[in-house]
UniProtKB/Swiss-Prot annotation:
Disulfide cysteine pairs (residue numbers): none
Source organism phylogeny: Bacteria, Pseudomonadati, Pseudomonadota, Gammaproteobacteria, Candidatus Palibaumannia
Pathway entry: Sulfur metabolism; hydrogen sulfide biosynthesis; sulfite from sulfate: step 3/3
Primary role: Catalyzes the formation of sulfite from phosphoadenosine 5'-phosphosulfate (PAPS) using thioredoxin as an electron donor.
Protein name: Phosphoadenosine 5'-phosphosulfate reductase
SUPFAM superfamilies tied to this protein: Adenine nucleotide alpha hydrolases-like
Length: 245
């Protein structure tokens, strides 16, 4: 496959861009996750970045990508409301994998946000959307711009939620390439990779958490729940970072 020209793709209308990406994705679907990463590093423009929420399976993508580009910037958007175990997990993986961690936060501190808006996560879907815009979307957009990002790796998987079930391996989002190397993996493949490379799940995995975000909008899985029901009171799955703008 030839090197993709981001400027050409961004100049296309949506239908032309979709058609151009379809052929590439047909080939990427038949590659292993490792091959997808190596292909991207060879054919997509630099600088590249990797985003991580340091959730349940985070070690997979972090190891997968940094094994091939060790110094790639790893973007974390820190809301200030993560679980203590998440902060400990971040420290552990940063040391273990020698991550080039870049932490971005909202301009307004958590305490100031609560003073100004109250507890947004208790104010229904609109409150949650504003909370995510302040604490997740704006910091991530700022990170992508400040780091000059042209290619963005992320660890999304289709089996995680209905909103991710049809995502392609490669897309253009926010005028940059976004590659999802493990998009088609199931839980068994995740477990196998972690075991093979001596990596751990997030500490809360053993306590019944399937997905981990902020303390106030994450709950344990119970029988009858889908994974996406454990976040944002079941009102939504995405925080906005991975949604088309």
């Amino acid at each position: 496959m030839k090197v993709l020209d981001l400027r050409e793709l961004n100049a296309m209308d949506k239908s032309q861009q979709t058609e151009a990406m379809t052929t590439v994705n047909l080939q990427l679907e038949n590659m292993t996750a490792e091959h997808r990463v190596s292909w991207a590093l060879e054919h997509l423009p630099q600088p590249a970045v990797l985003s991580s929420s340091f959730g349940i399976q985070a070690a997979v993508s972090l190891h997968l990508v940094t094994s091939q580009q060790p110094n790639i910037p790893v973007i974390l958007t820190d809301t200030g409301y993560l679980f203590p175990e998440t902060y400990q997990f971040i420290d552990q993986l940063t040391e273990q994998l020698k991550l080039n961690l870049k932490v971005f936060r909202a301009y307004i501190s958590p305490a100031w946000q609560e003073a100004r808006y109250g507890k947004l996560w208790e104010q229904g879907i609109k409150g949650i959307q504003l909370y995510n815009k302040i604490n997740k979307v704006e910091p991530m957009n700022r990170a992508l711009i400040q780091l000059g990002s042209l290619t963005w790796f992320a660890g999304l998987r289709r089996t995680q939620s209905s909103s991710r079930s049809k995502l392609p391996v490669l897309a253009v989002q926010q005028c940059l390439f976004k590659l999802l190397p493990i998009i088609d993996w199931d839980n068994r493949q995740v477990h196998s990779y972690l075991k093979k490379h001596g990596l751990n799940y997030h500490p809360l995995w053993e306590q019944g958490y399937l997905s981990v975000g902020d303390t106030h909008t994450t709950c344990k899985w119970t029988p009858g729940m889908n994974e996406e029901d454990t976040r944002f009171f079941g009102l939504k799955r995405e925080c906005g970072i991975h949604e088309e703008k």
